[in-house]
From Swiss-Prot:
Present with 3140 molecules/cell in log phase SD medium. It is found in: Cytoplasm; Nucleus. The lineage of its organism: Eukaryota, Fungi, Dikarya, Ascomycota, Saccharomycotina. One of its GO terms (cellular component) is cytoplasm. This is Uncharacterized protein YNL162W-A. Keywords: Cytoplasm, Nucleus.
Length: 72
């Protein structure tokens, strides 16, 4: 999300950095990670926060999560 203006990178309610939350194979919703902030679910149009996620981006995050797991 670094190629977007600050208004689309930081939460308009609490100024936390927004994150993509995968909801389907190639679609994510842009959400605020703060537990006390309801963005974007407190907005009138939540669908405006849906975005396409490229397969390469999904795989990159999955590999990172797998490699960061503690190994026995």
């Amino acid at each position: 999300m670094s190629d977007k203006p600050d208004s689309q990178v930081f939460c308009p309610n609490c100024n936390e950095r927004l994150q993509k939350c995968l909801v389907q194979q190639n679609y994510a919703i842009i959400i605020c990670p703060s537990l006390v902030c309801g963005y974007p679910f407190n907005q009138r149009e939540v669908l405006e926060n849906l975005t396409y996620v490229d397969d390469n981006d999904v795989l990159k995050v999955a590999k990172k999560r797998l490699s960061s797991r503690s190994k026995p």
